[in-house]
Amino acid sequence: MIGLRPAFSTMLFLLLLTGGVYPLLTTALGQWWFPWQANGSLIHKDNVIRGSALIGQSFTAAGYFHGRPSATADTPYNPLASGGSNLAASNPELDAQIQARVAALRAANPQASSAVPVELATASASGLDNNLTPGAAAWQIPRVAAARQLPVEQVAQLVAEYTHRPLARFLGQPVVNIVELNLALDALQGHRAK
């Protein structure tokens, strides 16, 4: 019985430390130092949560920039079902999906003369990606400008304005957050696109 007391005391101490003190401390520090990130990087417009800067949304109207395809089953951009399609590059089903996406993108973007950007035809590993390269966003500018009856230059300027560059140039590539960009388009015109 004497040998159990130190083991039980150690277990109780570690349980309180790792199950109570550590989670409370990390939560408090996160809320103190990084409150926006710790609360999900939520985007607020007119005191309403419009989305998260970390999770993509399904934009299908011609007046919006479209993000990467979602690989989440049943409901696009479902954060509870995050994950890729798990189809191998050699799988004919993946090839058929990509070909169908390319055909749909070409039909929706008849003004685009260059090749369809890869990230518009392929889903990300999480299936929830909210960022595109500036090139993939630029590829969609003619469609969005025509649908919103805006000058192409004005939409291109908005894409440039919402292009986020990495802190150090060698640590990544510039990206455009599609959720933020589409909300900025709505704010520019004062309404939602049809």
From Swiss-Prot:
Bilayer topology annotation: Single-pass membrane protein
Cellular localisation: Cell inner membrane
Main location: membrane
Transmembrane segments: 12-34
Record GO terms (molecular function): ATP binding; P-type potassium transmembrane transporter activity
Any GO BP: potassium ion transmembrane transport
Domain of life: Bacteria
Subunit annotation: The system is composed of three essential subunits: KdpA, KdpB and KdpC.
Protein name: Potassium-transporting ATPase KdpC subunit
Organism annotation: Salmonella typhimurium (strain LT2 / SGSC1412 / ATCC 700720)
Designated gene of the protein: kdpC
